[in-house]
Amino acid sequence: MENMSPKLVEGDEGGFGELEVDVLRAMVLLHGYAWKPDLHDTLSTIWRLKGLDFNQMVEASELIPKVLEKLCQKRILRFERRLRGDLSRSEPLEDTLYCLENERKISEMLSSDPIVLRYRKEIMGYDSLKF
């Protein structure tokens, strides 16, 4: 992880480059940890901010499992199955928790990313941020 370069954040020629970056954006916005449904919700919002239409969002969401697997293989992301609470159920729910291996470094690399800044301003309400 120490040798992580900006190239890993920019994506690669493997076909998932921009989706990998979108996952990293979502993980940074979620402070390095995300339950699977929260990650997918954040990705949908990112894609909406980027102007993707419904069909593009469906195509992208179908590729996300492969993208997550690839990021885990690169040791940028890890996951584990855990129990979490769910207000609609009386029992805990087993779900997947994703974690960035080096959240601080990736956050620094994406600190001036226009999509991250726009999300923080428009969705999270951080009005003091400038583009």
What do the PLM-derived regions correspond to, one by one?
Residues 22-30, 42:
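Short amphipathic alpha-helical elements of helix-turn-helix/winged-helix folds
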Residues 42-45, 96:
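Residue-identity detector for threonine
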Residues 2-25, 57-65, 69-131:
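Phospho-regulated, low-complexity intrinsically disordered regions of nuclear gene-regulatory
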Residues 38-40:
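A short acidic, leucine-rich amphipathic alpha-helix
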Residues 28-35, 48:
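Short capping segments at the starts of secondary-structure elements
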